[in-house]
Amino acid sequence: MIDSIFNFSKSSEFHQFCELSAAIGRNPLLVQGAGGNTSVKEDGLLWVKASGTWLSEATEKKTMVAVDLAKLQRAMAQNDERVEKPQYFKADPAESLRPSIETVVHATLKHRVVLHVHCVETISWAVLENAEKLLAAPLEGLDWVFIPYRRPGLPLAREIQSKITDKTNVLILGNHGLVIAADSVKEAHQLLLEVHQRLRRTRREVTIPKSNFALTAESNYRDAEF
């Protein structure tokens, strides 16, 4: 298992995954601060963003941690309470990084590459009361589902599990964000761009209110209490 960790972490595919993760992390329309998480599955391992790390630094410092995928999935099937603490399923117990609390969400999806972002465009729809109905038109033709808000971690993973099919690769998370799933880094990137573009809002013109500075120049209107 340790050899697998070393070999894949040195592969070109892993570097492509880290490059995409970093690019996503540098885009404030997709990720804010230390938010968002990404993963890639390889040789029985689930490489996922570590808790407390920044996606934007994925090519600069150690950001991903390997999880024993089969062990985690077995625990999920058995309702093992440890799945709420994915550090129990690290492939290398000596690794100091802790897997993201949303590791179980990544393990639930069968696709090789999973991107979870807090896309501003997506959230502008996902916060609406009738979001699922409104999203039907812009997302027509995609294999997508709407997931009502659930607490990150196992509750969210269970809700996803109850809604998806093997073909589902776009998940709109109510009041939360967006999940993209694909079988390659390139496909995941392309699908993310497509969904982001489809959900773009028309920018509104902002009118700057006029003020009669002559009337307010000698007043204390800024200090007034309301």
Question: Where would I find each of the regions flagged by the language model?
Answer:
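Glycine-rich flexible loops
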Residues: 1-226
